[in-house]
Swiss-Prot record:
The keyword Disulfide bond applies. This is Defensin-like protein 122. It is found in: Secreted. Keywords: Antimicrobial, Disulfide bond, Fungicide, Plant defense, Secreted, Signal. The keyword Isomerase does not apply. Expressed in flower buds, but not in stems, roots or rosette leaves. One of its GO terms (biological process) is killing of cells of another organism. It comes from Arabidopsis thaliana. Pfam families: SLR1-BP. Residues 1-25 form the signal peptide. It comes from the Eukaryota. Belongs to the DEFL family.
Length: 76
């Protein structure tokens, strides 16, 4: 094989490997928490960050609701 063909095959394998690595780390988990009082957005966000780290996102279910939903990386 010529040098150009070998380099082209190497680049294809490298790019495919990087794409596969990127898509594997994007799995998200959800944690549904119910309370006794109506959900408040800032408290929901703070609780999610406390439980799952700074990358977690918290949001209240459609209002009025007593449920908070945390979304975070499953790998964390």
């Amino acid at each position: 094989m010529s040098k150009t063909t070998v380099i082209a095959i190497f680049m294809v394998v490298l790019v495919l490997g990087l794409v596969t690595k990127e898509t594997q780390g994007q799995e998200l988990c959800h944690d549904y928490m119910s309370g006794t009082e109506l959900c408040e957005e800032d408290k929901c966000v703070a609780k999610c960050i406390w439980m799952h780290g700074t990358a977690a996102k918290g949001t209240c279910m459609p209002k009025p609701s007593k449920q908070c939903v945390c979304t975070y990386s499953c790998n964390a």
